[in-house]
């Protein structure tokens, strides 16, 4: 049974309801994996699905961060890492020194205040937890912008 939602902030509410979950099993098994995989993107997809956003084509179902980046970029629904995001956007990271060509990690923007971006991220230390970063932080690759109207 899905947690039905109607606005971008509802994806935030779904993510908030999952804070403290560890291991990612509900998310990667929902996706179709039989054993644990890196699940940050799967968690973002699961939250979107709870809102009906995957069926509606608002957010893709993706297990690899690069696929998500390309989906948003191809649709012109992308902000650079220097931008100030809004709640409900997906925040993509590329870690310093990474060998990944596109992105390493993804979370959901919970709020923005006083020059900081507050996030909820799956697979952060193998759990769903809150983090925060300065706006424009160098490891933020950019933001996927769900369009709900």
Kindly label every feature range from the protein language model.
Residues 23, 31-32, 66, 73-76, ...:
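Solvent-exposed, flexible loop/coil residues
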Residues 1-56:
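N-terminal capping segments
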Residues 6-13, 66, 70, 83, ...:
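Generic alpha-helical secondary structure signal
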Residues 18, 104-106, 130, 140:
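A generic structural signal for ordered secondary structure
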Residues 114-149:
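Active-site signature of cysteine proteases
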Residues 54-126:
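...with weaker cross-activation on analogous glycine-rich loops/strands in unrelated enzymes
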Residues 3-6, 17, 72, 109, ...:
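Compositionally biased, intrinsically disordered low-complexity segments
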């Amino acid at each position: 049974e899905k947690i039905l939602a109607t606005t971008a902030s509802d994806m935030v509410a779904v993510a908030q309801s999952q804070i403290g979950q560890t291991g990612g099993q509900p998310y990667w098994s929902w996706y179709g994996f039989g054993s644990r995989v890196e699940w940050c993107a799967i968690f973002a997809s699961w939250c979107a699905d709870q809102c009906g956003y995957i069926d509606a084509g608002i957010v893709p179902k993706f297990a690899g961060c690069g696929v998500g980046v390309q989906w948003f970029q191809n649709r012109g629904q992308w902000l650079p890492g220097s931008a100030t995001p809004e709640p409900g956007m997906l925040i993509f990271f590329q870690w310093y020194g990474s060998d990944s060509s596109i992105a390493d990690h993804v979370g959901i923007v919970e709020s923005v205040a006083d020059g900081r971006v507050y996030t909820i991220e799956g697979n952060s230390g193998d759990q769903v937890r809150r983090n925060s970063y300065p706006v424009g932080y160098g490891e933020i690759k950019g933001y996927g912008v769900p369009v709900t109207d």
